[in-house]
Regions:
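Conserved thiamine diphosphate
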Residues: 10-27
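Acyl-thioester-processing domains in fatty-acid/polyketide/NRPS systems
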Residues: 23-358
Length: 358
């Protein structure tokens, strides 16, 4: 360790003290040095004086990079027949996120989802003639800390181009940064919940009139408790869905059917205040604390950040009656368009608004 005096100036001594590095006094250092080098029976003495200078939490080396291919088809995941836009089944954005998370969990045994950051829908996957023969997940570890957590950048792509062309180009569909941890933090409380039942609208109304295009397996909204310009509160419960129906996208530690209700909530709000349909674009951050089990009664609170005729950005919180969180989403954003109303099968472009009274 550093000795006081000599090259350790008063300024350098203060710097060591700020960093909790012990400076050895001349008297103590001289005494220990003399005792050690003059003691019998030590051919090669090694003397350590002072506190440990090991810096905790140093990033580990050897970041992994790998690719995984998957063929996707509707026959193996028939649940998406209940997620049609127009006539075509579409992979829900949150199921794409769950797909990337699931691959990380399989490749990193012992780790669990903590968060997804900067999730983007670049080109959604449709189960029609545009469905690629194969999809590639590219994973790149970008940070790892002493086995406590690892951050993985994930991208989903496919090859596009003419069959006769000499080279096909990658087409990117989704991207995010997944944080995997060995110990998920305790679920915090969402302390700004509004459980007032001022509107009391059955969720079935929105599924039946085409505000929401989702079929029975995705119909988890039981009631709209309240709705206003600043947000809304929903009462929810997920239907039972077999593993066989979910197929290649079977939910494990992160239930995408629960998270999908967040985007359904945004759709209800978009119709109420803009008379438009909406589709997911991105989420700044999703934090996951515990899973929502089927038939569990839970609530979804939405707080609007900003909205316009073309976009809606909001924070969404899935929680129990006391406010204890399951999942929260910061900066979720959807694109708005009145042309989506027809695709969603909206039956009456004024009825939905009139049913929600201020």
């Amino acid at each position: 360790g550093p000795w006081e005096g000599g090259m350790v100036t008063p300024e350098l001594k203060r710097l060591f003290e700020e960093r909790n590095v012990e400076v050895i006094s001349v008297e103590d250092g001289t005494r220990v040095f003399v005792e050690e080098v003059t003691s019998a029976g030590q051919e090669n003495p090694i003397v350590l004086i002072g506190n440990s200078m090991v810096v905790p939490g140093e990033p580990e080396k050897g970041m992994r990079k790998w690719k995984i291919s998957r063929r996707v088809n509707l026959e193996e995941s028939p649940v998406f027949q209940d997620h049609k836009i127009g006539k075509n089944p579409v992979l829900p954005a949150v199921h794409a996120m769950a797909w990337m998370v699931d691959v990380c969990e399989q490749e990193l045994p012992g780790f669990m989802l903590s968060s997804c950051e900067n999730f983007k829908v670049l080109n959604g996957v449709k189960f029609d003639e545009s469905l690629a023969a194969e999809y590639v997940l590219e994973l790149q570890e970008i940070e790892r800390l002493n086995g406590n957590f690892t951050d993985v950048e994930v991208k989903v792509s496919s090859l596009s181009g003419s069959e006769s062309g000499s080279k096909k180009l990658p087409r990117f569909h989704y991207s995010t940064k997944v944080r995997m941890v060995q110990q998920v933090p305790e679920a915090p409380l969402h302390d700004r919940i509004d459980m007032s039942n001022s509107h009391n609208l059955p969720g079935s109304t929105f599924y039946q009139d085409g505000t929401l295009f989702h079929g029975p397996k995705f119909q988890g909204i039981e009631q709209v408790l309240n709705i206003g310009e600043q947000g809304l509160t929903l009462e929810c419960s997920l239907p039972e869905i077999s593993v066989a129906e979910q197929g290649q996208f079977a939910a494990r530690n992160f239930n995408p059917f629960a998270a999908d209700l967040a985007f359904q909530a945004m759709l209800i709000w978009a119709w109420r205040f803009h008379q438009s349909g909406s589709l997911p674009l991105k989420t700044d951050l999703l934090e996951h604390f515990r899973n929502v089990e089927p038939a569990t009664r839970f609530f979804l609170s939405m707080s609007v950040n900003k909205s316009s005729a073309s976009t809606l950005n909001a924070n969404l919180f899935l929680h129990d009656e006391q406010g204890l969180l399951y999942t929260r989403m910061w900066g979720a954003e959807v694109t708005l368009s009145k042309s989506l109303n027809t695709l969603f099968g909206k039956k009456n472009n004024t009825a939905g608004k009139s049913k929600i009274k201020n």
